[in-house]
């Protein structure tokens, strides 16, 4: 949280750009402008020490960025707010179920990939409370009528989640159930209120699934899981906060060289064999493609797949299927470069995990989002 605040402070440089219509956290219509141009919120921001409830309200007022410059939906701070570090009893107000033109494409580069601070994760380290705010948990309605969270994904704009096709269709429907919900802004799945020391996060946003779109080329009968990528449309828009933000898609011209640093994150199995209730992160290297092909001879990997990991106790296995393989650009922006697809065992030395390459599906992602946002 305080890493978020440091980021927020360092971002305070003058922002030129046309204002846009927006809705404040209290429901009033206003304009999306630079924080410097919004006197009420700037005055609140100048308080020292900065109260936790003010930090939370500023975060919920953010409506985009210009580079690293935050823009806010300008309006007065509510006269009475409970100054508490606990999560509010209600989740941040979610957006309308109406169709918004800006939801027809992934979030623009100046509004995504900014970190405010196994398929399960092995050897991972615990994330900060507000780290990787685009992470999503996919929930399924089981035959017993309960909700089971079995896959991961990432938020790419207010309305859409990027995940794996095998998290949407095929065997998972029989083994687990029907995809019905997405949870955003989660940190510790065992706690109703996520706190580190005296700082607490907002309540996670639980949003119903409207529709899901596995890639048409995917079949769970194919052992190599080619085209293992999918899009989930939310029934209502996610509200951007410090704890919920979209990630950028990798440029389709970008290269990932062997040995490049990439990251996975999720709530997966740790070395003691148990799922982690707390969001973990893990740094992995891109694995040599030819060596990876040799390891997976029976699967015939294609050019649309990436191999990463292969270091003992450091890999992703089933619990975070559909979760992201990510990299940080030199200017500090996070991009999703891959989607967790499959692997053999967990954290086996010399055996990398296999990920669907996002760069090879940019056109399909954009077209699917545009055609379904109606």
Curated annotation (Swiss-Prot):
The clip domain consists of 35-55 residues which are 'knitted' together usually by 3 conserved disulfide bonds forming a clip-like compact structure. Activated by the removal of the N-terminal inhibitory propeptide. Ca(2+) binds at residues 186, 194. GO terms for molecular function: calcium ion binding; serine-type endopeptidase activity. Inhibited by aprotenin. Not inhibited by EDTA, PMSF or leupeptin. It is found in: Secreted. Residues 83-97 have a biased composition (Polar residues). This is Phenoloxidase-activating enzyme 1. The gene is PPAE1. Disulfide bonds join 22-73, 32-63, 38-74, 151-167, 292-307, 317-346.
């Amino acid at each position: 949280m305080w890493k978020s605040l440091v980021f927020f402070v360092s971002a305070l440089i003058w922002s030129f750009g046309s204002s846009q219509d927006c809705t404040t956290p209290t429901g009033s219509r206003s304009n999306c402008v630079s924080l410097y141009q919004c006197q009420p919120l700037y005055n609140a921001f100048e308080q020292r020490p900065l109260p936790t409830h003010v930090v939370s309200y500023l975060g919920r007022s953010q409506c985009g960025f210009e580079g690293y410059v935050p823009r806010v939906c300008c309006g007065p701070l509510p006269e009475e707010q409970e100054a508490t570090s606990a999560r509010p009893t209600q989740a941040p107000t979610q957006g309308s179920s109406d169709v918004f033109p800006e939801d027809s494409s992934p979030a623009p580069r100046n509004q995504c990939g900014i970190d405010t601070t196994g398929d399960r994760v092995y050897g991972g380290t615990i994330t900060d409370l507000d780290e990787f705010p685009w992470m999503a948990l996919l929930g399924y309605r089981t035959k017993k009528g309960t909700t089971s969270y079995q896959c991961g994904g990432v938020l790419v704009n207010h309305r859409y989640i990027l995940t794996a096709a095998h998290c949407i269709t095929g065997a998972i429907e029989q083994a687990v159930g029907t995809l019905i919900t997405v949870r955003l802004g989660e940190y510790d799945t065992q706690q109703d209120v996520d706190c580190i020391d005296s700082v607490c996060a907002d309540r996670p946003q639980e949003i119903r699934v409207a529709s899901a779109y596995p890639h048409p080329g995917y079949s769970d009968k194919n052992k190599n899981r080619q085209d293992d990528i999918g899009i989930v449309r939310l029934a209502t828009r996610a509200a951007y906060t410090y704890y919920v933000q979209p990630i950028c898609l990798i440029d389709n011209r970008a290269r990932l060289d062997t040995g490049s640093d990439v990251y996975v994150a999720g709530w997966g199995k740790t070395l003691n064999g148990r799922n982690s209730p707390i969001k973990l992160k893990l740094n992995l290297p891109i694995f040599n493609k030819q060596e990876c092909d040799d390891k997976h001879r029976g699967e015939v990997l294609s050019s649309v797949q990436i191999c990463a990991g292969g270091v003992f106790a450091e890999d992703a296995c089933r619990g975070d299927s559909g979760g992201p393989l990510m990299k940080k650009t030199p200017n500090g922006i996070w991009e999703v470069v891959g989607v967790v697809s499959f692997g053999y065992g967990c954290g086996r030395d010399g055996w990398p995990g296999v990920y669907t390459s996002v760069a090879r599906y940019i056109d399909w992602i954009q077209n699917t989002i545009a055609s379904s946002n109606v």
